[in-house]
């Protein structure tokens, strides 16, 4: 049984489409930092890169958990075309810090996505704990520190758009 040490439960659905040795979600489960689940609940925040809505700090009051769907980017369109119960949100633009997709916009691992969500929702301490489990975790934070801070202060999607403009980031996917 998982002990909840954070404000919210952290869940992952592992679809086992990638190299298991490189699976960031599996590592979180192994260290007891996330629950491996099969179905999402109605009160979970589902991180979905194709959602129509962007994650905002105010979303925290709507949910009691965060769920990352661990799948291959090669299968992501098909995976996220399926319906997951819960509140679906996408992250604003961020740069990957992982060695496979280093500095690519929005090609995040599950741990990067969960960490970014935690930071935006106001839990930078848990984000730091998660990223510390990976040799490259600090790289993700270094690349996105200012963005994450600004995103965590945004009160609306239009503010997210302004932040993206200030940083010269394309938000056409938004």
Listing of model-derived features with the role each one plays in the protein:
Residues 1-34:
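Short, extreme N-terminal leader segments that mark the start of a protein/domain
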Residues 16, 40, 165-168:
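Acidic, serine/threonine-rich low-complexity regulatory regions at protein termini
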